[in-house]
Amino acid sequence: MTLTRREFIKHSGIAAGALVVTSAAPLPAWAEEKGGKILTAGRWGAMNVEVKDGKIVSSTGALAKTIPNSLQSTAADQVHTTARIQHPMVRKSYLDNPLQPAKGRGEDTYVQVSWEQALKLIHEQHDRIRKANGPSAIFAGSYGWRSSGVLHKAQTLLQRYMNLAGGYSGHSGDYSTGAAQVIMPHVVGSVEVYEQQTSWPLILENSQVVVLWGMNPLNTLKIAWSSTDEQGLEYFHQLKKSGKPVIAIDPIRSETIEFFDDNATWIAPNMGTDVALMLGIAHTLMTQGKHDKVFLEKYTTGYPQFEEYLTGKSDNTPKSAVWAAEITGVPEAQIVKLAELMAANRTMLMAGWGIQRQQYGEQKHWMLVTLAAMLGQIGTPGGGFGFSYHYSNGGNPTRVGGVLPEMSAAIAGHASEAADDGGMTAIPVARIVDALENPGGKYQHNGKEQTYPNIKMIWWAGGGNFTHHQDTNRLIKAWQKPEMIVVSECYWTAAAKHADIVLPITTSFERNDLTMTGDYSNQHIVPMKQAVAPQFEARNDFDVFADLAELLKPGGKEIYTEGKDEMAWLKFFYDAAQKGARAQRVTMPMFNAFWQQNKLIEMRHSEKNEQYVRYGDFRADPVKNALGTPSGKIEIYSKTLEKFGYKDCPAHPTWLAPDEWKGTADEKQLQLLTAHPAHRLHSQLNYAELRKKYAIADREPITIHTEDAARFGIANGDLVRVWNKRGQILTGAVVTDGIKKGVVCVHEGAWPDLENGLCKNGSANVLTADIPSSQLANACAGNSALVYIEKYTGNAPKLTAFDQPAVQA
């Protein structure tokens, strides 16, 4: 039976239907017969996985590399960890009375139920909530990194189901680049942070100075959104061998700075003062007459207004190197030298994203673009700026060949009527707690007044919001408000332990999929082959939502799957890539042959793409290749933002002091840096054996400057309590001179493990502030926080972050 979208809604709403729980696909014959090493992939690259007696025993990278990637050793941990969710579970109080549970989330025991019971309960309560409140009451934004693959995309599969059900509230933006991706379209006409960069071969050939501003590629290039092609680290290795001078601007002496060693000059400003430092450099360029007036006149708009601010004409405060030195802690002479070095050489300004994950984060990348414009090197080989060299191997030239399409949340012929009638909405992703606290509340976002939905149901699939969201204790309180929360997940994360219904999902090693390597290069197609059978009662998201679609109305499963099972979808995606490759005269084997060969496919080099210069066409002809801004030029002053009238995001790059920084700290407060960890992908793998490489006394480490440690009586290896008005955490001390005095670093991503108000595992977001970057982007500001530290002298509480929750027999 084939139903149109209108017939589907008309005949069913969300009426109950017969449920037949389909099992996960059987283990393919090739895995049983061949055993040994199986080719697959993850965010951290293509891997060979060794299987013995139905268990993964080891995993190694499948691509040659100079710099090892520790994350590629974790496949066995991912599948066989004791933190796995083994069975469908329902919170006892919720199971007893879904309409009025006796206990709050996070305080209850769980009850094991069958898959049929779990899906029936979800369906009934989803139906009730949707009918009573409409689609906007269902939040299925479900942000998170999930797993690699073009089919088994947890959030997409959830949203595909919710579209069939009649729509949902989603999210806009992300936690990684929330501020930059909203401001950059006003400045350069694109989100910029996810764009291909000037090619690495041109950097190595033409750049004379490379500035790494707030980025640590030796950590962040271990991963990619699809799967890393591993070329970014190879290019940084070549940059090191070239001997070119590298300027690293970062409050902490990162792994990347250590890697470059004598090639790198480390400059450590006070946290959050990057705009002031850039302004000091810009003022020096201007006063020395080293700014490129011709470039500014031809390719930008609004520089005269900005120069009035720079000189102090508009506010009586010249943004000189002396002024910048007082704010940043960087000596005046060094600021002047930086300006002179950048102006005298072909300079590439590479910037990371941590600098914009701060209050007023929009200003950081805007000011860096302005600085690059003053240097006049944008659009030249090896000059200008780039915001993705640290992410997914930006700058690795795009290959020629096939590109895999991906599963869509939309279903052919079945567009959501809710979207058509305005019944769907999206909130800025980092404002989820604001939305829960203020249903129906008004807020400003990117020039428009918007309204928070009244969220009654949340489904989180493949994401750890209790780890990536700021101010965990505030989140926990807001999390009590919805009527139902479902988490479908592989592991007992803190989010899962605060859900009403928890569904066990397969890891990528327990199912079949495909992925590209290189989000910019599209260098390889990799078969993500199932290595072992689904563990315990784990099922694929695809099968779970297909069964729920059948409960919407008989025939719903057929609509959801479009009549294709796992392998049929993979063949469909592969065939589309093969067709695209053929159009470019690149040969790919037929799907069945490709799948049996257990080999990846590498796409063809492109000499043209190896010569790619970001903004090269714009520089060559700014009229023909105008940018997507109102003026068609780089907007140093934005008339659009002037009309918005936001005091927290003025019309040109501006130094705005955050609420919590060195300038507002008392004598005992330190600034908190929440950097990306070396041996995790955010919160992923926190349970893995790699933990032994970094944990101190089985806690998340805290990096403390030697003088600060001495001041507070802390020695290397001590347990340290870190706290502020938002919460407290327990960490292990790493004492070093390799961090700015007055700054401490706790890497983001540790799983929250709260007991009597203390996070025993050291989750940084227990301490960070849940405030918006500004009214423009409403992005997260996790790097704007002050904390206190002290040596912990009590008995160390037992870590329980990775334990199973209490289950009623």
Swiss-Prot record:
Its cofactor is Mo-bis(molybdopterin guanine dinucleotide). It catalyses: trimethylamine + 2 Fe(III)-[cytochrome c] + H2O = trimethylamine N-oxide + 2 Fe(II)-[cytochrome c] + 3 H(+). InterPro entries: Asp_de-COase-like_dom_sf, BisC, CT_DMSOR/BSOR/TMAOR, Molybdopterin_N, MoPterin_dinucl-bd_dom, Mopterin_OxRdtase, Mopterin_OxRdtase_prok_CS, Prok_Mopterin_Oxidored. The keyword Signal applies. One of its GO terms (cellular component) is outer membrane-bounded periplasmic space. This is Trimethylamine-N-oxide reductase 2. Expression of torYZ allows E.coli to grow anaerobically on a wider range of substrates than does expression of torCAD. Exported by the Tat system. The position of the signal peptide cleavage has been experimentally proven. Can also be exported by the Sec system. It comes from Escherichia coli (strain K12). Coiled coil: none annotated. Reduces trimethylamine-N-oxide (TMAO) into trimethylamine; an anaerobic reaction coupled to energy-yielding reactions. Can also reduce other N- and S-oxide compounds such as 4-methylmorpholine-N-oxide and biotin sulfoxide (BSO), but with a lower catalytic efficiency. Its EC number is 1.7.2.3. Belongs to the prokaryotic molybdopterin-containing oxidoreductase family. Disulfide bonds: none annotated. One of its GO terms (biological process) is anaerobic respiration. GO terms for molecular function: electron transfer activity; molybdenum ion binding; molybdopterin cofactor binding; trimethylamine-N-oxide reductase (cytochrome c) activity. Binds 1 molybdenum-bis(molybdopterin guanine dinucleotide) (Mo-bis-MGD) cofactor per subunit. It is found in: Periplasm. Keywords: Metal-binding, Molybdenum, Oxidoreductase, Periplasm, Signal. Transmembrane segments: none annotated. SUPFAM superfamilies: ADC-like, Formate dehydrogenase/DMSO reductase, domains 1-3. Mo-bis(molybdopterin guanine dinucleotide) binds at S176. Residues 1-31 form the signal peptide. The gene is torZ.
